[in-house]
């Protein structure tokens, strides 16, 4: 996104207790950055995600900050897994929070790309929010997933037959097995 820095809405007093305090800190730092010659496009605001296990209002407060930043034309980022810290089945909470954050204007997230449901939810939320190019990205992702699943299904019924070298290379490309592709 070309950001020059990530704005952490913290003060000498620490983490702000209210969203209003957080928004005031964002505005103060943004004004200083602009005074120093930066543009709002140079700034990415961290939503400062807290765990809902300790603060039941943490998600709403972060989502409100993301909305505030969108209204100000500022990009946003947040560490998704912070929201679910200390809770069971964290991936469910992380996925739900990500989709809510995208609808509020989240620009980017620090997340685990190996969590398929989380990544799929991001593609789906972008599509539903009518983000430019999201329709094609969603279709391409789902087509890739379908191709892998179909190939896996077809392979399951062909255990008695040896795969051709071409089929083995295809499987390696689809599954991302870089080391195996050289062997095949």
Predicted regions, residues:
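ATP-dependent carboxylate/acyl-activation modules
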Residues: 1-42, 50-77, 81-184
